[in-house]
Amino acid sequence: MDTSPKNIAVIGSGVTGLGAAWALSRNHHVSLLERDTRLGGHARTIDVTMGEKLVPVDTGFIVFNHRNYPNLTNLFDTLDVATEATDMSFSVKSGRYEFAPTPGALLGDPRHITSRRTWAILRGINRFRKQVAGYETIPNPDDTLIDFLRGGHYPEPFITDYLLPLAAAVWSGAGTDAASMPVGTFLHFLSNHGLFEIERPRWRTVSGGSREYVERIAKEIPQVRTGVNVTAVARAPDGVEVTTPDGPEFYDEVVLATHAPQTLRLLGDDAREEERSILGAFRYAPNRAVVHRDASVMPRRKAAWSAWNAVGTPPGSAQPISVTYWMNRLQNLDPNHDVFITLNPGTDPEQIIDDIWYAHPQFNPDTDRAQQRLPEIQGRDGIWYCGAWTGYGFHEDGLQSGLTVAAALGSPAPWHDSITPATPAAIHSARSQTLAGA
């Protein structure tokens, strides 16, 4: 393989692009191009007033753990990024009903002892855990999750008041789309890495917010250009042409660290049939994230307040499941000044501090097949594809994807040979395991 330094453009500065550009910079001449005026993608930190202080609060990427995020852990260690322990408790409310799968929350409300709804949820949890353990033997793994649950006569409270809200917490608000996921995929990531292990992953958050790692990694990439609106990427006789409003630029290789639909738009008429088929399989759902101080979105009983708090909706509802993150608990903030982030609020909360939209990939049998076909187009004519969409949409998925491309171009991460990359399923089963209180 040719190991001489190449002129490479990385388009997109989320964790995927940052990781790819950082690793590639060790052996190549790299230009990181970002349309926005800031770097980081979902790694976005804002300053919130708490008393007399401005405190950093994350609005996108918030938590990770050492066991299931090996690349992210190694990156943080390499960059000397400080992290701290966090809490991953979970609650659901539906109307006046509130449920949190912890002894304190259940026993703290005597109504749960005689509630048919609560007992239906607990029976469903117990039965579903057994189903997860035997996921490899289910007869129709391509059935949707909701069809599997309804066909298996699972209690409706378990579906609407527990499992789908749990999925919404795991997938950043996209619980209604989780209902359409292949049940085999869903059960697999719940089972992988031991859903029923007593020793659960210990979750952590970046001290000072995720911008700490973004700023540190950016300093190690020699050429970073923000505010560059790339409008097209096309194959050229001697490389790849990148078009911006300032004119064309030419590179030996181009790494597209963008959402799949954005990638397809950049290729435009130059996209081949295989690229249209693979990249065109992915759809994204918009999720609104509102940072605020309105405690009315939380459970009525303070004892039920958790790090992650979901509001259930019936499957198929036009309204996405709403999830509220209690940032004081997640990021160890001053308990005297509550700050919340609500995804997809049904009505606007009071005391809004910040309002932003994120997009998350939606997964189904078509995307599963598209992911398996990615090697068909990877690296052909100097164009490379990466992003969290190549896994299950999480930070480790994105970083692993970018580092995989860098390694293929002869510039692996320094820890490349010392870890076994986490599968997407392992990442999500760990998060689900913790939220479920297994």
Region roles according to the model:
Residues M1-I8, N27, V48, A370-Q372, ...:
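Extreme N-terminal leader/targeting segments of oxidoreductases
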Residues K6-L32:
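N-terminal Rossmann-like FAD-binding beta1-loop-alpha1 element of flavoenzymes
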Residues S25-T49:
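Glycine-rich FAD pyrophosphate-binding loop
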Residues I46-L72:
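N-terminal glycine-rich dinucleotide-binding loop that anchors FAD/FMN and/or NAD(P) in oxidoreductases
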Residues D47, T102-L106, S317-A438:
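Conserved flavin/dinucleotide-binding core of flavoenzymes
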Residues H66-S180:
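Mobile amphipathic helical/loop "lid" adjacent to a hydrophobic cofactor/ligand pocket
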Residues L187-T244, E249:
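Helical element adjacent to the flavin cofactor pocket in flavoenzyme catalytic cores
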Residues T231-A232, A236-A359:
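Mid-domain catalytic core of redox enzymes
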